[in-house]
Amino acid sequence: HVTIEWTANLSGEFDLRALMEMIAEDMRERADGVFPVGGIRVRAYRADDYVIADNAGPDDAFVNFDVKMGAGRPAEFRQRYFNALFERITQFFADLSARRPLALTLYVEEAEGWKHNTIHQRLKKAS
């Protein structure tokens, strides 16, 4: 699961759909099958209320990425994969970062969870 949180002052400044699709594709194609396709979810929420730094820069903005995944992925995979993903995210925002103050963050959390997901069944039938 990836949750993207972005400041409202970035509205219209980047292609949110393309960003979400890039991340989902990355998880499908570059993660060595570690993330089951049926479990990949990417969502985004605009932050309308926020304070950044000293609250004196009206153009200051952020995009935060929170990843939650089930426990047990090897540490070396996590390091390699999320370093590469963050590099792709940074490149996605390179032009915007050059034009305005922008903070990008990626946090990864291993979580214990309870699941019921019939999307896996649909994917098996489709293949």
Region annotations inferred by a language model:
Residues H1-S127:
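A domain-level signal for the structural core that forms small-molecule/cofactor-binding pockets
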